[in-house]
Amino acid sequence: KQALEALTSEMIPVKYNPYPVKTHGIDNMPYVTCNDAFINLDEPDISLDLSQKIYSKAKFMGSHCQGQTEIKLDSIGPTIRAEHHGNIEYRRLSAEHGGKHTDELAKGLIERRLTVRECARIQTFPDDYEFIIPKSESQPSLSSSDAYKIIGNAVPCVLAYNIAKNIADKWNLYFK
């Protein structure tokens, strides 16, 4: 009863708080940037990872529409929306569409949206998690659209782990 009252109060006492202590930001570790999350990922055309090979081909609709922006590589990742209708953010945009990663474009890399794997990395999924599953007789398929929805609906894996760990550590306090 005491734990329930504490957990439903406007200011949850630290002793009962199920959320992990803040670890990143000012006076803490630096935030994980998109550059950090994308380290060692090949471009889709040379990747062997099916989740890195596939990305939304939705055309650029103008900056007035959702998902028509280029990610900032030196910043935290964008919100990965479950209902993006193909309008997942761009990994890189052409200069004509307002892109800033002109050095990458100059190297011949193409304007494209984030891959399924890049979205998964932003949400801290491990690389061995398979999102794209081709149809076979022994298992149902999972499309890229389904994969984007799964990733967008997910609580980031590292956050979920730390909340679960904190609850496990306080289990006896909650249920005594």
Where do the language-model regions lie?
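S-adenosyl-L-methionine-dependent DNA methyltransferase catalytic core
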Residues: 1-176
